[in-house]
Amino acid sequence: MIPFKDITLADRDTITAFTMKSDRRNCDLSFSNLCSWRFLYDTQFAVIDDFLVFKFWAGEQLAYMMPVGNGDLKAVLRKLIEDADKEKHNFCMLGVCSNMRADLEAILPERFIFTEARAYADYIYLRSDLATLKGKKFQAKRNHINRFRNTYPDYEYTPITPDRIQECLDLEAEWCKVNNCDQQEGTGNERRALIYALHNFEALGLTGGILHVNGKIVAFTFGMPINHETFGVHVEKADTSIDGAYAMINYEFANRIPEQYIYINREEDLGIEGLRKAKLSYQPVTILEKYMACLKDHPMDMVRW
């Protein structure tokens, strides 16, 4: 029996000891995301045979993540399959990236059916691209930045500190009011995860920034490292009446992310056309494909998560 347990804030060191050394760049492995969304997925974890493993619920479907670690991956997968059998559920893993798919096909050939989940693909950027916006491909972005600076020459960027959490919460509440959050599917869950993250900002290991215009908050963003070379930006909110606020908070935060992080993961577009267009406009170097991987013995329709 795998000794799964609920994820808590106290598990940060245990989990990041695996994820920070890993080559996995998917946002699902961010400790902040794992904790902030646990209310929805009942996420649990365990450490077995030098691997970090996760199980969670996507609606009524039990699901797992690809194990993180080094060693006998095949043996660990067999234990996860046995765990699913004991739970009387089909064995499926969500968030399986292309390199993980290759590993599965190598060690358990012809055992899995892979279903691509484009809406959940992560957008990966070079930190240096977002921090400098150099080159012709970023001309429009530089124009946004320059226009913002000319319009609001006295703007201020400050880091998120405990005494500034409330103004972030206030902007989020106003953003939701303007964007009719209560009428859009999924925004209630997003709000709950965001509020949890802000209330547990330091315990989660988050860093972030706030943009002020005329002394008033107009944007904020935050995130944390996913692994040793990839930083995840998890949340970005701005006052849409302030032209260029989104572009400016993106630019300023990218300039504060330590240079050791080569990549920035700005997460998925959830199949939302406007969000996809915005993420593509920043010229990702990789769109990190994700798949649902289920045993061929138990084919499944695509699971939303």
PLM regions and their residue ranges:
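Amide-forming acyltransferase catalytic core, primarily the GNAT-like/NAT-type
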Residues: 1-49
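Conserved donor-binding loop and adjoining core beta-sheet/short helix segment
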Residues: 28-99, 212-240
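Short, glycine/charge-rich beta-strand/loop segments that flank catalytic centers
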Residues: 90-107, 119-121
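Short catalytic-loop micro-motif centered on adjacent basic/acidic residues
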Residues: 92-93, 158, 263-266
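Short, conserved active-site entrance elements at the starts or edges of catalytic domains
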Residues: 163-216
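Aromatic (often tryptophan-rich) hydrophobic motifs at membrane interfaces
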Residues: 206-296
